[in-house]
Amino acid sequence: VQATIPLMPADFEELLSQMLQDGRKQLWLMTAMIGFYGLREGEICLLDVDENGDVYVGGELKRDVRALQSGAEKEERLALGLDLKGQPGEARRVAQLFRSGQIGLPKAVKNQIDKVSERNSYREVGAAYAQILKRYKPWQELVKRNPGLRPYGLRHGWAWRAHKYSSRPLHYSQAAAFMGHSVETHLKYYSSWVNRKELEEAGKKYNEALQSA
């Protein structure tokens, strides 16, 4: 398991602000969507944003695109926007901007999205984004300050905020559902951020249920 290094809230805010100052609006939009909603990079091409600004991720990153398109296996999950302090409603505002199509995505990412159906894979979409981000100087500065930080740190940062940022943290089962993975996977990566009482309670309930079965 690679080290789980989150992009911390202050760094996330600074990165977004710098992207706007640098006129990198498309990079800003994609980075904001991934960071505010805890997405896998490739999921950017699976999003369905409704008129209220609610964000749904269509299915998982499956190889069989035809199954996805037919709806046979398509299970949308709701993604939760976690705001930054002092920016109420910003996640939803970003989602509505994404839905409007006013800004669009970086060209290299769009090129890969166009090839998704022939490749039956979304992996290159995420790789194209990661490459752009890694070449961006302010990101390189963040990596210097946080050795081991990767683009996936945007998603890890969402998990950190879910558990450590608010006085009312999400339960780990809720966070796992919003991130689109199992509770086991969630705890494998993020257990050190999860409320210890919750974990103890879960263990106790499990053992009680076992005895009463």
Regions found by a protein language model. Name each.
Residues 26, 39-40, 74-80, 155:
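Short, cationic motifs built from Arg/Lys/His that form the positively charged side of catalytic pockets
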Residues 6, 61-64, 179-204:
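Catalytic-site neighborhood detector that most strongly recognizes the C-terminal catalytic loop/helix
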Residues 46-96:
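Conserved tyrosine-mediated DNA breakage-rejoining catalytic core shared by Y-recombinases
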Residues 2-41, 45:
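Basic, Lys/Arg- and aromatic-enriched nucleic-acid-binding interface segment
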Residues 43, 158, 189:
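Ca2+-coordinating acidic residues in Ca2+-binding motifs
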Residues 80-85, 93-128:
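Low-complexity, serine/threonine/proline-enriched polar segments
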Residues 21, 37, 111, 118-177, ...:
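Short, basic (Lys/Arg/His-rich) helix/loop patches that form interaction surfaces
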Residues 202-212:
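Short, basic, alpha-helical segments at the C-terminal edge of helix-turn-helix-like DNA-binding modules
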